[in-house]
Regions:
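Short polar/charged helix/loop
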Residues: 2-136
Length: 136
């Protein structure tokens, strides 16, 4: 484990769920976590509804872009969070994996995407609290 935990979020397209999780954890962790994201079949662009919802929250996802999933992403991680990539996500026996069952925001209206991002937000906050451990 490094000084900063490494947490990649993995999904199929790296345009919605994993993007939202990365942006949210980056925001809440304020540099205390090395946050990454990738997709097993990366999209060519970000999900516009997810971008809109994150922007509504005062976050800037515009520096992000869909990235391909590599074995190195998993090997460098302390905790890997998967979101629907199933068997296409690489697994390293030395790494802890957490699977988050979440609706894919692709093609969903912004009202539905808000609920998905709310759920991701709740899980990201819980993960950050777990990574921080008990207060000294």
């Amino acid at each position: 484990m490094t000084d900063r935990p490494v947490v990649p979020f993995l999904c199929v397209h790296n345009a919605g769920r994993s993007l939202a999780a990365k942006v949210l954890l980056d925001h809440y962790a304020a540099g205390a976590v090395d946050v990454r994201s990738a997709g097993s079949e990366p999209a060519t662009s970000l999900n516009p509804a997810v971008v809109d919802v994150l922007t509504e929250r005062g976050l800037d996802p515009t520096r992000e872009f869909p990235k391909p999933l590599t074995d190195e992403v998993a090997r460098a991680a302390d905790v890997v969070v998967t979101m629907g990539c199933g068997d296409t996500c690489p697994e390293d026996p030395e790494t802890r994996y957490v699977g988050w069952e979440l609706t894919d925001p692709a093609g969903q209206p912004v009202e539905v995407v808000r609920g998905i991002v709310d759920e991701i937000d709740t899980r990201v906050r819980a993960l950050l609290a777990e990574l921080a451990g008990p207060a000294a």
